Amino acid sequence: MDSNNQIDSSWLKRVKEVVDYVLDDGLTCIINVHHDTGTKGWLFADPDDEEFSKEESKFKKIWIQVADYFKDYSEKLIFEGLNEILNKSSNWNGVSKATCDIVNQLNQDFVDIIRKSTGNNPTRVLVLNTYAASAAKGEMTNFAFPADTIKNKLVLSVHAYTPYSFCSGESDTYKVSDIDSFMSNLNNIFIKKWYPVIIGEFGVKGNNSTLDKKTEWATYYLKKAKTYGIKCYWWDDGGSYKIINRHNNTELYPTLIDAMMLVA
């Protein structure tokens, strides 16, 4: 972006190119504001941040431009306002309600901008995050769905590498009770109230030495999510969590992939 917060036209063209790849394959595509948030970003959730109004204005200008650029795309293109927005202390959970309310405010800004746009945007499906996209009970409880001009077009997304010690490779064991607990919270806080939920990121770091255990974990995770009607998206980052080699289009862990596809 330039000094006037205008997105580089070549960048938008590249995003469009990738979006078109996805849609041309008959898939649904999600665009979000990604690493503008997080530990290395510029947009933070701090209630006492003197820079917030400037950050919020920049956030709004991004979505005004993106909404207009893609306004005539079909409902197969979904917008997601944020990704794992943190405070400046980089806390991933256990933050105050006031901090979560900053995220709620940004989510409302996002919805308002898209709905005031033209084309297919007034009815487009929009995805929202909790603080840090956290599946912790406190952050989910302090999340508030924005007001919208149309019904049943908002979806909550959380990220859940659960249990984190296993998913990050720190431990080679896990407890299914950890998975049961956070999904039960998702159900009680949102799904029972007819709010749709997706797990926008999940996964486990890959290596063949514990492939059987990881396949077992993924199978249980997805089966549990399926009982609540939750769709899950593996975080294939091309790095530690990758399950597909993008250079030669081959599966790195076909046993794991086959097991997940069987559940899905």
Would you name each region that the model predicts?
Residues 61-77, 84-230, 245-251, 255-261:
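Extracellular glycoside hydrolase catalytic/binding regions
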Residues 1-35, 39-81, 102-117, 224:
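An active-site-proximal structural segment forming one wall of the substrate-binding cleft
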Residues 40-41, 208, 242-243:
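Short secondary-structure boundary/hinge segments and terminal tails
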Residues 12, 43, 64, 93, ...:
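Short linear interaction motif-like sites in intrinsically disordered regions of transcription factors
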